[in-house]
Swiss-Prot record:
Protein name: Small ribosomal subunit protein uS7
Signal sequence, start to end: none
Name of the gene encoding the protein in the UniProt record: rpsG
PROSITE patterns xrefs: RIBOSOMAL_S7 (PS00052)
GO cellular component annotations of the record: small ribosomal subunit
Role played: One of the primary rRNA binding proteins, it binds directly to 16S rRNA where it nucleates assembly of the head domain of the 30S subunit. Is located at the subunit interface close to the decoding center, probably blocks exit of the E-site tRNA.
Length: 159
């Protein structure tokens, strides 16, 4: 474990179209091989398709979807006396949002490989699924809650 100062968090600038830092974080999550303009195009196209389907603003749809997938509790491994316990702990807000963005990206990637549709279509459907509290990303969030509920007996072993 490092004993130096903690690394400073870099400030993320808001995206150009909506002026949202959350959306820029998602663009950085989706981006591959440094191709930010391609990632922006994919996300903006998916949000415009979602706008047409629902009739609300793209940013509000996205923020609600991320909010629905954001976990508030997770389990962490804790070794005590030769036994390893899964201890439920609260998730920091920054980590919770990062997990939600990663899960949406992961579910989109899995759907794209499975169905053969374009990334834009899969991302749009995954955002709408998260908005309506269903889909792959929401399922991952529910699994976190189930694990925490199953290991509630070990909550007194908190860090």
């Amino acid at each position: 474990m490092a004993r130096r100062n903690k690394a400073k968090k870099r400030e993320i600038s808001p995206d150009s179209r909506y002026g949202s830092v959350l959306l820029m974080r998602f663009i950085n999550t989706i981006m591959k091989c440094g191709k930010k303009s391609t990632a922006e195009k994919i996300i903006y196209d998916a949000l415009s398709l979602a706008e047409k389907k629902i009739g609300e603003g793209g940013l509000s749809i996205f923020e609600t979807a991320v909010g629905n997938v954001t976990p508030s509790i997770e389990v962490r491994s804790r070794r005590i006396g030769g036994a390893t316990y899964q201890v439920p702990v609260e998730v920091r807000q920054d980590r919770a949002v990062s997990l939600a963005l990663r899960w949406i990206a992961k579910a989109t990637s899995a759907a794209r490989k499975k169905s053969g549709k374009t990334t834009v279509d899969c991302l749009q459907s995954e955002i709408l699924d998260a908005y309506n509290k269903r889909g792959g990303a929401f399922k991952m969030c529910e699994e976190k809650y189930k694990m925490a509920e199953a290991n509630k007996a070990f909550s007194h072993l908190r860090f």
